C-alpha cells in the first residue's frame, strides 16, 4: 500500500522467519530506488533533460531518508536485525546510542519529524528488547551481518553519490 508523500507499507500473509528476510524486505525498496535514480541520472546525461536530474535527486533523497537508522524506517529495521543478531544487549546499546545521537541532532537542527520518528523508534526498540526471548526470528550469522552492513552502506553511498553528481 502506498500513501503519496508519506510512504508505503508492504503486507504479506507469510510470517518473517529470519532476520535475513527482514533485512532483504527492508532494503529492497531503497535498493530499487537506487537503480531508478541511476536510470534517471543516465537519462539526464544522455538527453540533458533537467527533469530527469530532478527525479534522480528527489528519488535519492526519499530513499536516503528511508534508510535513516531509525525504526520504523527501513534503515532502522536493517540496524535492528544486525544489532540484535550480534547480541541482544549490544543491540539494545547500539540502538539506544543511535537514538540518543538522533535526538541530539533533531534538537540541534530543529527537526521535529526526526524527533517524532526517534520517539516511535525508541519505543519499538524497547519492546523488541523485552520480546527478545519470545522472538522466533533466526539471527543473522556473521557472514549475513557483514553482507547486510555492506549492502546498506553501498546503497546509502550510491544514493549520496547521485545527489553529489547532479550537484556538480
PLM features: residue spans?
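Hydrophobic transmembrane alpha-helices and their immediate loop junctions
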Residues: 1-168
Amino acid at each position: 500500500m502506498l500513501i503519496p508523500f508519506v510512504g508505503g507499507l508492504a503486507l504479506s500473509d507469510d510470517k518473517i522467519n529470519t532476520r535475513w528476510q527482514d533485512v532483504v524486505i527492508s532494503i529492497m525498496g531503497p535498493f530499487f530506488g537506487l537503480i531508478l535514480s541511476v536510470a534517471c541520472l543516465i537519462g539526464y546525461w544522455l538527453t540533458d533533460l533537467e527533469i530527469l536530474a530532478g527525479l534522480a535527486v528527489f528519488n535519492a533523497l526519499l530513499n536516503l531518508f528511508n534508510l535513516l537508522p531509525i525504526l520504523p524506517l527501513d534503515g532502522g529495521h536493517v540496524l535492528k536485525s544486525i544489532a540484535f543478531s550480534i547480541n541482544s544487549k549490544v543491540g539494545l546499546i547500539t540502538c539506544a546510542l543511535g537514538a540518543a545521537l538522533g535526538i541530539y541532532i533533531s534538537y540541534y537542527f530543529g527537526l521535529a519529524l526526526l524527533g517524532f520518528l526517534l520517539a516511535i523508534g525508541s519505543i519499538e526498540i524497547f519492546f523488541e528488547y523485552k520480546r527478545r526471548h519470545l522472538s522466533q526470528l533466526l539471527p543473522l550469522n556473521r557472514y549475513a551481518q557483514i553482507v547486510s552492513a555492506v549492502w546498506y552502506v553501498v546503497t546509502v553511498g550510491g544514493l549520496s553519490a547521485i545527489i553529489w553528481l547532479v550537484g556538480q
